Amino acid sequence: MLLLDLMSSPSPQLLVAAAQQTLGMGKRRSPPQAICLHLAGEVLAVARGLKPAVLYDCNCAGASELQSYLEELKGLGFLTFGLHILEIGENSLIVSPEHVCQHLEQVLLGTIAFVDVSSCQRHPSVCSLDQLQDLKALVAEIITHLQGLQRDLSLAVSYSRLHSSDWNLCTVFGILLGYPVPYTFHLNQGDDNCLALTPLRVFTARISWLLGQPPILLYSFSVPESLFPGLRDILNTWEKDLRTRFRTQNDFADLSISSEIVTLPAVAL
């Protein structure tokens, strides 16, 4: 099993220190060691094109702290090219502008489907991006925004902000995180959805990284089991593409993709 060569890469101790010194300052509690190492693995996965973005939700550290964190990683020789901090609302995502633009351009070509889980429906239903014209325009807007940034990647870690007062952040984040079947719903009906007590097929993708450490959770998303047969082709294409991209890198090993069916009394999106 080929795992990270610790002789040519930063030690786990240095990766933990980089996170705790930059993301745990002031009143913020420093992330635990396991969280620090997992975050570093996710960031490396973004840099290597295995996922378009990572949503930072470890504590209340903001964009400036994340910039400092990524600068620390780069100073350790951990990142080979600049990443970008994209702030949407009160949320910060770490993205590779090149990779996320490629992903969003594929989204505009109809490579993913959406599941409408609006509370006004008795059951979830599949819809395409062409049925969600406002969302389609939003994806195009994000592409234009990120393409403008790519002209100035001389900065080690760049930062920008998108205004999102009327966005469905659940759907936008699902797209940016690379889910093949994001959930969507009508914002004027609140955050309720029709997924309660609905059997869901939960997909997880994991990769091995540091020897002796748990695998990195690369993806975790679900689709209603009743819609799975009609979504199988899209999910198979997503898996094939991920495996292809995985074979182009040598930082991670043992890509594992699995699924299980769960039923929950309520589902928060």
Swiss-Prot record:
Pfam families: DUF4504 (PF14953). Transmembrane segments: none annotated. Belongs to the UPF0739 family. This is UPF0739 protein C1orf74. The gene is C1orf74.
